[in-house]
């Protein structure tokens, strides 16, 4: 678990404080992504019950080689919590109360097959504050798996938590 403490100045509304806090941490979030091989997207998003629906940081590359560009974050007010396709990256880790790897998927906006790692953030009293996450070009991981050798003729492969194959040079994904 990741715990974060917000020390809100007296008189500042919580929704306004999220925006002020974002200004303070935005560069650190971007630097973290800029120093992570294969990072395509990085985000810090706040619980929409306590913040503006587009508050936080969202930065994305248009290709693996391009610069991160800050964009307007997803508007939470446009989606129901059960809409896994659009906001599952936020609600699934919060509900699990632990960091999770999302299943690999094709991001149609940038045409990159990617995997997401998302960490929920909680206050000391257990209240959900938000999430911090990163989407990574899945080929960065599969290339590492392909380069791994086991003894002289063995090789590595990648499975998910249920044992389904995510990457194997001789077997189709999902078997």
Sequence positions of predicted segments:
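Extracytoplasmic/secreted envelope proteins and their assembly/folding machinery
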Residues: 22, 26-30, 87-90, 118, ...
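Residues that line or immediately flank small-molecule/substrate-binding pockets and catalytic motifs
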Residues: 46, 136, 160
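Extracellular/periplasmic ligand-sensing ectodomains of membrane signal-transduction proteins
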Residues: 12, 16-19, 32-99, 104-112, ...
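Conserved beta-strand and immediately adjacent loop positions that scaffold enzyme active sites
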Residues: 41, 115-118, 155, 162
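Conserved beta-strands of PAS-like sensory domains
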Residues: 110-149, 167
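Intrinsic low-complexity, intrinsically disordered coil/linker regions enriched in small/polar
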Residues: 139-175
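Extracytoplasmic/periplasmic helical hairpin
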Residues: 2-31, 147-149
């Amino acid at each position: 678990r990741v715990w974060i403490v917000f020390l809100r100045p007296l008189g500042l509304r919580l929704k306004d404080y999220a925006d002020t806090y974002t200004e303070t941490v935005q560069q650190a979030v971007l630097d973290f992504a800029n120093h992570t091989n294969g990072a395509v997207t990085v985000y810090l998003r706040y619980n929409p019950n306590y913040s503006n629906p587009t508050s936080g940081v969202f930065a994305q590359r248009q290709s693996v080689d391009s610069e991160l560009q800050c964009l307007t974050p997803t508007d939470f007010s446009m989606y129901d919590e059960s809409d896994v396709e659009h906001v599952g990256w936020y609600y699934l880790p919060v509900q699990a109360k632990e960091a999770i790897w999302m299943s690999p998927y094709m991001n149609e906006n940038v045409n990159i097959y990617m995997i997401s790692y998302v960490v929920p953030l909680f206050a000391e009293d257990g209240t959900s504050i938000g999430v911090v996450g990163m989407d990574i070009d899945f080929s960065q991981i599969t290339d590492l798996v392909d380069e791994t050798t086991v003894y002289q003729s063995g090789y590595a492969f990648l499975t998910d938590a249920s044992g389904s194959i995510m990457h194997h040079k001789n077997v189709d994904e999902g078997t």
